Amino acid sequence: MPLSYQHFRKLLLLDDEAGPLEEELPRLADEGLNRRVAEDLNLGNLNVSIPWTHKVGNFTGLYSSTVPVFNPEWQTPSFPHIHLQEDIINRCQQYVGPLTVNEKRRLKLIMPARFYPNLTKYLPLDKGIKPYYPEHAVNHYFKTRHYLHTLWKAGILYKRETTRSASFCGSPYSWEQELQHGRLVFQTSTRHGDESFCSQSSGILSRSPVGPCVRSQLKQSRLGLQPQQGSMARGKSGRSGSIRARVHPTTRRSFGVEPSGSGHIDNSASSTSSCLHQSAVRKTAYSHLSTSKRQSSSGHAVEFHNIPPSSARSQSEGPIFSCWWLQFRNSKPCSDYCLTHIVNLLEDWGPCTEHGEHNIRIPRTPARVTGGVFLVDKNPHNTTESRLVVDFSQFSRGSTHVSWPKFAVPNLQSLTNLLSSNLSWLSLDVSAAFYHIPLHPAAMPHLLVGSSGLPRYVARLSSTSRNINHQHGAMQDLHDSCSRNLYVSLLLLYKTFGRKLHLYSHPIILGFRKIPMGVGLSPFLLAQFTSAICSVVRRAFPHCLAFSYMDDVVLGAKSVQHLESLFTSITNFLLSLGIHLNPNKTKRWGYSLNFMGYVIGSWGTLPQEHIVLKLKQCFRKLPVNSPIDWKVCQRIVGLLGFAAPFTQCGYPALMPLYACIQSKQAFTFSPTYKAFLCKQYLNLYPVARQRSGLCQVFADATPTGWGLAIGHRRMRGTFVAPLPIHTAELLAACFARSRSGAKLIGTDNSVVLSRKYTSFPWLLGCAANWILRGTSFVYVPSALNPADDPSRGRLGLYRPLLLLPFRPTTGRTSLYAVSPSVPSHLPDRVHFASPLHVAWRPP
């Protein structure tokens, strides 16, 4: 007859009416009993012939393609101008005095952050925006492109201008200026002995040697170039040759645009209209950038007719411009859904490309991307805004993967010891935390995102892609991309983006200037950054407890009034460092803090309400007697593992599940095992903080007997049959706890000390976890252990009782997690048998 849940509870000694522990508990270590129970609960039978279940409630396999939903109404979030102060170390020192070595080292790591992968694979531009939403391809394309544009405008991305130069917006850092040797750059054109271009520099090249030099001339340069000098470039056509001050020869743009006659560049050609054509279609530019040898000695200058800003129409008469979008203006509509109708909606479609405020030299960067991007909901609670997902997973894969640095994640007990108190709490929201940390420009060639432009993107989605002649955008192929779907999508998007549609239909390549989220290095750097800042804050405000995990920063103080005044000063301090806080999202928690998925109060720690709800849903949906795919089990174990420390039996209760995942077999829940887990997770007990104290209870064991020293009393007993030493030591610890009720026990066994009972016989592990819940262990060397003699059967000999002090740990080094964090600890071995046959490795 199968084991009922009631019997199983009794067996695990979870009920009060169990017999004496010294008799009952050693039985649970018996191999035969463990095997029989495993068979009864159907835990050992891993090979099943019935088809596996691949979905349980919301849990699907780990690699399942749960299709995210596209929202045509997505708003692109706005990004503040984030500029972390470069002299952050000095500013902190002015505030708190000299920094510790640790704080300095962490802050130097991120000023600037560096990224050197072993190998970078370059992907074609078509892969830049992932076709994640085939139904909404065009809409997704423009929304993503707009998101990238927003990031570039906010100074988070560099825009690749040529193989060796990039432009960006926002305040430059010193390492971005060094790349220009701080020299003034003139570049003159020798094409027709005509006018020269000037691009003036303020330590960085303000723009590349093409085009919109007009705006830059009106800026006061740090080198003191006055606007009048800037115009020396006009009118002195005698100056051929280039006056260049040690600038790398390829900072010139090689655009394949043939000038149709030369003329002055008039100041009236305002910066917009001078951008108007100089883009010379990125498409044609890119098609030969990657292959082009250096062009004429001073690069192709792009020359214009003398165009007043308003005359955007004259550009349709110039026969040369091969801009895909503007070409529709000259062509006859091919149907009612021809793009010509849309292009004729506006006179002035604005520039083909935009340029950043600053220009910079970069290592050789091909016209390719290294990762794809797509949009998803910002978070499950906010579906109105989008979030950009960047997939740089190439750096975590294959034999050339980068081994990301590990960093300390506070474990549950340390967190409770540190934060469980009667303080008042609030949490700060750092807006766009990752985008605070600057990346060295040398990393740009490895972290490229972008898009191939609308025509290529559309062509790739339709079957006609073969006909499009990308090189020349030849007329007869222009209308190949016209279709009803595209027309309707563009008309709707025109309402949102207006003339930006033109800009966004061009190809673009962007590199990260701040750390992106899709690289394993980023969580590490962010953790270093926030923990260093919190460390500084704790020293500056000794009566404030500041703590952080990634971008989650919490402040605690004795009273609400005190907390509010601290909040003001700390906010001002963080703002002075250039850290952007989102004041609307500051949460005041009162005395129970919500942090890292836990609720932490003076009583201890429990999982947050939404996790408790998830647990209930999970058990409601869990099928009985049908094999569940092990990948789905991984998901289930992820959730149950998070809450395991709050249950009676803890992790050991999940061991059968771990075993099936390890052997990659399906798992079948028997009614009893499901009922057992369900009851375990219905009543959650808080994890309490450890108190420091003196240890006065000691336990020790040999394979044949156990001994206890409780104050001045000594006790001993023998086992019916010899047991593996770790099992014996665990039993002795359980006896010590049940006899003395002490929360502090001295032991000389490292496995018991680690409080990981997953490698013991299954039933014993579950029972011991409940008996020893809330117990702290102190290590005592065997030679000094007062329980050593009784365990060997000698009660007469007394060793002096040690007074061993116990200090709870708050060390952040208690658990090293590989970044980004991995699923909860999977043990090396899972045994229903005893650990006797297993060479034990320390945890």
From Swiss-Prot:
Region spans: Spacer: 178-346
Query: What Pfam family does this protein match (any one)?
Result: DNA_pol_viral_N
Q: Where is the composition biased (Polar residues)?
A: 289-299
- One MF term in GO for this entry? DNA-directed DNA polymerase activity
Region labeled Polymerase/reverse transcriptase domain (RT) — which residues? 347-690
**Which residues participate in Mg(2+) binding?**
D429, D551, D552
Q: Where is the Reverse transcriptase domain?
A: 357-600
What is the regulation of this protein's activity? Activated by host HSP70 and HSP40 in vitro to be able to bind the epsilon loop of the pgRNA. Because deletion of the RNase H region renders the protein partly chaperone-independent, the chaperones may be needed indirectly to relieve occlusion of the RNA-binding site by this domain. Inhibited by several reverse-transcriptase inhibitors: Lamivudine, Adefovir and Entecavir.
Q: What is its EC number?
A: 2.7.7.7, 2.7.7.49, 3.1.26.4
Keywords of the record: DNA replication, DNA-binding, DNA-directed DNA polymerase, Endonuclease, Host-virus interaction, Hydrolase, Inhibition of host innate immune response by virus, Inhibition of host RLR pathway by virus, Magnesium, Metal-binding, Multifunctional enzyme, Nuclease, Nucleotidyltransferase, RNA-directed DNA polymerase, Transferase, Viral immunoevasion
Quickly give the catalysed reaction: DNA(n) + a 2'-deoxyribonucleoside 5'-triphosphate = DNA(n+1) + diphosphate; Endonucleolytic cleavage to 5'-phosphomonoester
* Region feature (Disordered): 220-273, 289-316
Domain of life (superkingdom): Viruses
Q: Where is this region: Terminal protein domain (TP)?
A: 1-177
Query: Single Gene Ontology BP term?
Result: DNA replication
UniProt site positions, description: Priming of reverse-transcription by covalently linking the first nucleotide of the (-)DNA: Y63
Write out the similarity annotation.
Answer: Belongs to the hepadnaviridae P protein family.
What is the purpose of this protein?
A: Multifunctional enzyme that converts the viral RNA genome into dsDNA in viral cytoplasmic capsids. This enzyme displays a DNA polymerase activity that can copy either DNA or RNA templates, and a ribonuclease H (RNase H) activity that cleaves the RNA strand of RNA-DNA heteroduplexes in a partially processive 3'- to 5'-endonucleasic mode. Neo-synthesized pregenomic RNA (pgRNA) are encapsidated together with the P protein, and reverse-transcribed inside the nucleocapsid.
Misc. comment: Hepadnaviral virions contain probably just one P protein molecule per particle.
Name the PANTHER family for this protein: PEPTIDASE A2 DOMAIN-CONTAINING PROTEIN-RELATED, POL PROTEIN
- Record text about domains: Terminal protein domain (TP) is hepadnavirus-specific. Spacer domain is highly variable and separates the TP and RT domains. Polymerase/reverse-transcriptase domain (RT) and ribonuclease H domain (RH) are similar to retrovirus reverse transcriptase/RNase H. The polymerase/reverse transcriptase (RT) and ribonuclease H (RH) domains are structured in five subdomains: finger, palm, thumb, connection and RNase H. Within the palm subdomain, the 'primer grip' region is thought to be involved in the positioning of the primer terminus for accommodating the incoming nucleotide. The RH domain stabilizes the association of RT with primer-template.
Q: What is this protein called?
A: Protein P
